[in-house]
A protein has these predicted regions:
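Axial heme c-ligation environment in periplasmic c-type cytochrome domains
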Residues: 381-389, 408-439
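Electrostatic cytochrome c docking/interface patches
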Residues: 337-365
């Protein structure tokens, strides 16, 4: 990384402290990935059982019930995906957008691919009976949706993986998306994800198809015990394979992000997963003797949830460690750039036209901190300098303005047309001292005065 140019970070304050954003990122990602797993796993199992149903009709009815869940889990996966996407944009703006830029057209293809996948999912669900005599067509529709659900996470995973390794960006830029896909740890991580999706869905279907309110009589060839055995097995087998896939992921991870704390989280997850495997095996053995869901099922669900949280936390710890030096250098580059800008403003080259606003006290503060979102006369993200000056041109306007800058609680209401779509980030005394804020207020009052 020492030989690569480091882009300057964006000199804007975060809306929350970085550790708080990291916790939010992990929490929201866990919620998102649970429903992504159920969406992908449900799609794969629905198609699998529909194919098996060609010879045994009972499997077709089972596949239909599974397919009904996918449109629900799909919607929840999309809604819950917004939060972690925003959080990672805030925490890792430069790495994330750099990776997006490198993967380019393939990255943006996620949007049309998701759209087509969702349309195929609805088509597969709502043509079940209409295409009952054309199973080849119907299965093809479901298989195409499943294939897209497999491709989309692959693209996303490859992109998020790339952002962690700035030293590989030039290689990826020259080699294209194929170079990104075939980085050593992408395919093992993808296998780990797909196995988790099938295991999670198997456990979900144990509850969905054998709970007290489930209409088991819709499956004449099945009983609660047989369904429970089948889907505990669906959950157990990929979980066992994870004990091979997990170490493969760890072995192929570049050491740049490894830390003792991250490995401790992984170790705890492995131990707990082994306990879950034991419990699922006992549930399979005792299924014939337990007509209802046992208490052990909920122990399994809770333990699996803790495993997911531990794995997601380990993932974030690895990312933070891998990008620690890059982030620090990027912030330093931003500081150096602001120093150069300030020097240029204070010492303009000979013959350079002078900005007439330079002589107004407070203009330099406005230019450095506000101009990205507030135009002088035009609304950008927030209201213009003229509008703000008119609003705070009262005897107590300076104090009210300081309150707004410090707390984002605006004591003066803008007109609807000038109302910003989001709250402005607060500026503490460490960012703008009292004199700078009051000087900024004076500048706004000055530019708001009617000109002769």
């Amino acid at each position: 990384m020492a030989d690569m140019p480091i882009p300057a970070d964006i000199p804007l304050p975060l809306p929350l402290p970085a550790p708080v954003l990291a916790v939010i990122l992990v929490a929201l990602f866990v919620l998102h990935i649970v429903f992504v797993n159920l969406m992908l796993g449900g799609s794969l199992l629905a198609v699998t059982f529909e194919i098996l149903g060609l010879k045994k009709p009972g499997y077709d009815r089972l596949a239909h019930h599974i397919a009904k869940t996918i449109t629900v889990t799909k919607s929840l996966a999309v809604v819950l995906g917004v939060g972690p996407l925003l959080a990672i944009n805030l925490l890792y703006t430069i790495p994330f957008y750099s990776a997006n830029r490198i993967t380019g057209a393939v990255w943006i293809m996620i949007i049309p691919l998701v759209t087509v996948a969702f349309l195929l999912t609805y088509l597969h669900k709502y043509t079940w009976e209409r295409l009952a005599r054309h199973k080849a067509i119907h299965i093809t529709i479901g298989a195409m949706a499943s294939l897209l659900f497999l491709v989309i996470p692959f693209i996303f995973l490859a992109n998020v993986n790339l952002m962690q390794y700035p030293d590989r960006w030039e290689e990826a830029r020259q080699g294209g998306f194929a170079a990104v896909l075939f980085m050593a740890n992408v395919i093992p991580r993808y296998l780990h994800f797909v196995l988790a999706a099938v295991a999670s869905t198997g456990l979900f279907l144990v509850w969905y198809l054998t709970r007290e309110k489930a209409q088991v009589e819709e499956f004449p060839d099945e009983s609660r015990a047989s369904l429970r055995k089948r889907f505990y097995t669906v959950a157990l087998v990929p979980t066992l394979i994870q004990f091979l896939a997990g170490p493969l992921v760890l072995i192929t991870l570049p050491p740049v992000g490894l830390s003792g704390l991250m490995l401790a989280h992984l170790g705890a997850a492995v131990v707990l997963a082994a306990v879950v495997v034991r419990w699922m095996w006992l549930e399979i053995q005792e299924a014939d003797n337990t007509p209802a869901l046992s208490r052990r099922f909920w122990h399994i669900v809770i333990a699996m949830g803790v495993v997911v949280v531990l794995m997601a936390t380990a993932r974030q710890l690895y990312r933070a460690t891998a990008l620690k030096d890059f982030q620090a250098q990027s912030r330093q580059a931003s500081v150096e750039r602001q120093k150069k800008v300030a020097y240029y403003q204070a010492h303009p080259p000979a013959g350079a036209p002078k900005d007439p606003l330079e002589d107004i006290p407070g203009y330099s503060t406005f230019k450095a901190n506000c101009m990205a979102c507030h135009g002088l006369k035009d609304k950008l993200v927030g209201p213009s300098a003229v509008v703000m000056g008119q609003l705070y041109a009262t005897p107590d306007g300076a104090d009210a303005f300081v309150t707004w800058i410090r707390t984002t609680q605006n004591p003066r209401r803008f007109k609807a047309a000038d109302e910003p779509p989001m709250k402005m980030p607060a500026y503490g005394p460490g960012q703008l001292d009292e004199a700078a804020v009051r000087g900024l207020h004076g500048f706004l009052i000055e530019v708001a005065k009617p000109k002769p």
